Each structure stands twice: as structure tokens, then as C-alpha cells.
């Protein structure tokens, strides 16, 4: 897990509750430039190394808990060193017929993605979010909790859609927007 802050600790719990845990992947630990990030916390796997300079092993897959503008940069560093990102879908998420979810995308607990929606690569879609039918989500987006994207919504690339936003039918959210 990249990042051992609050979202990283949340990602640890989510990873243990997601499809494939224990059969397709296990949690080895965190990488974080703040190697003391877990000093005041118990019951988490260790921070095994800083992010800077970390060399991914062939059998490792990653999820990234870092938000904001540094998320993409951090992930691209790991990808550039040969790292691969896990597509992680929480066991309680509901995916409709013909839904496509790209590599490295995280789908949180109790999230619903409607029929024929397409979700690109490296997105973070947090818990209790609704992505309506026929919606298209590009790459590198962060969609926070309790967001509703009604049917036919298009979210281009690199956007941040914050908690409880509601976006109506057939609206396009342009690249690098903040909602």
C-alpha cells in the first residue's frame, strides 16, 4: 500500500475486505517516505521502505492511498520502475451488466456502478458512491464518498469530485476539474 497515513490505514482495511484478498493478493506492508507514519498506531503491517527509490519486485502489486496532485506522480514513479497496480473492488460494491473497470482502479465499499458504465485506469472511487448507467470515467480521477454521477455522465481525466457532489444526467466534467 503506497502511503501509510489515514487513507492508507483505511485502504488496508478495504484491501482485506475486497475481492481477491487471500487468494489473488496478500498485504505485505506499506511504502511511505515518512517511515515513522505508523509509530503511534498498532495492528498494521510494517512500513517496508520509503517510496522514493523503492524497486518493485516482480510478484508485487500496489494500491495507492495518496490523494491530490501527488497521487498520479507517485503512481507513475512506481509504474516507471516496473510496478503494477491492482484493480481493487470491495466485496460489497455492486457492478452492473457490462461494466468495465480499468487497471489500478479502486472501487470502495457499497459503491454502485450502473449497467454499461466504463471506468478507466487508476481511479479512486470511494465508498457509498453511485456511478449511473452509461457513464464514462476517464483515468486518474478521485471521486470521494457519497458522490452521485447520474446516468450518462462523462468524467474526463485527472478530476477531483469531492464528498456528496451530485452531477446530473449527461453532464461532462472536463479534465483537471475540481467539483
What residue spans do the PLM features occupy?
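Glycine-rich adenosine-cofactor-binding loop
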Residues: 1-15
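Short hydrophobic segments within beta-strands
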Residues: 1-2, 31, 65
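Phosphate-bearing ligand-interacting subdomains
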Residues: 35-94
Amino acid at each position: 500500500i503506497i502511503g501509510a497515513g489515514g487513507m492508507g490505514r483505511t485502504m488496508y482495511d478495504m484491501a482485506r475486505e475486497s475481492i481477491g484478498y487471500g487468494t489473488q493478493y496478500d498485504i505485505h506492508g506499506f511504502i511511505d517516505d515518512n517511515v515513522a507514519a505508523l509509530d503511534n498506531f498498532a495492528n498494521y503491517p510494517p512500513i517496508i521502505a520509503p517510496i522514493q527509490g523503492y524497486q518493485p519486485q516482480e510478484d508485487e502489486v500496489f494500491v495507492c492511498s495518496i490523494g491530490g496532485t501527488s497521487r498520479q506522480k507517485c503512481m507513475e514513479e512506481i509504474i516507471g520502475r516496473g510496478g503494477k497496480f491492482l484493480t481493487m473492488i470491495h466485496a460489497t460494491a455492486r457492478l452492473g451488466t457490462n461494466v468495465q473497470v480499468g487497471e489500478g482502479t479502486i472501487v470502495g465499499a457499497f459503491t454502485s456502478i450502473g449497467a454499461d458504465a466504463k471506468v478507466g485506469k487508476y481511479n479512486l472511487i470511494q465508498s457509498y458512491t453511485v456511478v449511473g448507467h452509461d457513464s464514462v470515467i476517464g483515468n486518474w480521477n478521485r471521486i470521494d464518498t457519497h458522490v452521485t454521477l447520474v446516468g450518462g455522465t462523462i468524467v474526463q481525466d485527472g478530476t477531483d469530485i469531492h464528498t456528496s457532489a451530485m452531477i446530473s444526467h449527461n453532464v461532462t466534467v472536463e479534465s483537471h476539474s475540481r467539483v
